[in-house]
């Protein structure tokens, strides 16, 4: 945070930017190059054996309200150390975020923390601000799912999105299954004990750590051989030689022997095609086929990949190889005229790209004031704009009273001839 921030911004303090992910939350201030904190999106309750995830879509509203209230209190008063009444808020959200969740979140911010204004910004659109481009095919590989959404001339093409339940959660489930089936543990009492006899289930934090420290994505040729050996359709396919085994310490006394075959096979579930021939790579191609034909070439040459799962070693190289391999198949070859695919390299780690875009947008204070939902408007109506709602109020009603609109906004809303 700048030492003299009040002098250069007309007295208005920089906005708070929150990227509320299902696994981790990124939080910081607009105009900065990185978040102040990246913390698990969980809270701990007395008497509960496990931490409670804050981002849940299948619980009642009042329970969700209490979780969000406690979690955001931690963000403001343990990590950011600022008064929430003094600063606008930019919330990075998914376009598929359920309405009841975003309404509960804004109710917490306006009614409990009394923030001046809130802007709900799509994560896919914010990612493009870090690159200075206005058209791209954006793939977000997160914890629960992988979601692809084309952005053309700054407008999300909402009828061309695609999603699959392939992300960090699926990797953790597959990793736990293989570890419990194949791996052994050395303890102080005995050697080479089966893992289920020592611990019935593996905590999520340990699975995350094993995945990050030991797992990687193989190249296309090796990956196809691993998949062929796994399914063994013809009965004579041999698996490529595995990487070295890794000894992973568990709570200081136990040593878990992670097999090399697990290290490179776990991530293959992202690229294995299911019964409907769907994978992370086909998500991009299928979305591209739904786009207007005159936009496909530009979108194919501007791929942007964000999300923590995409940070696995070798992921981007494999994704590009998979796309180039699949585009030669009859399903796509006759429809997609382009064969050129390029992936951008954003100026931040993949898990922080959307947050950085929100920090850039939040630093434009005139634009931020004209696009945010003000506290006065929310207190009068109790509503927030929603792209999937047909009865949104006029845009002029949502902005701060007395706030001068920038020239582009004046032209957009002007009724003068």
From Swiss-Prot:
It is found in: Cytoplasm, Cytoskeleton. Keywords: Cytoplasm, Cytoskeleton. CDD domains: ASKHA_NBD_Arp10. InterPro entries: Actin, ATPase_NBD. The keyword Transport does not apply. One of its GO terms (biological process) is retrograde axonal transport of mitochondrion. SMART domains: ACTIN. Its main location: cytoplasm. Part of the dynactin complex that activates the molecular motor dynein for ultra-processive transport along microtubules. Belongs to the actin family. Subunit of dynactin, a multiprotein complex part of a tripartite complex with dynein and a adapter, such as BICDL1, BICD2 or HOOK3. The dynactin complex is built around ACTR1A/ACTB filament and consists of an actin-related filament composed of a shoulder domain, a pointed end and a barbed end. Its length is defined by its flexible shoulder domain. The soulder is composed of 2 DCTN1 subunits, 4 DCTN2 and 2 DCTN3. The 4 DCNT2 (via N-terminus) bind the ACTR1A filament and act as molecular rulers to determine the length. The pointed end is important for binding dynein-dynactin cargo adapters. This is Actin-related protein 10. It comes from Bos taurus.
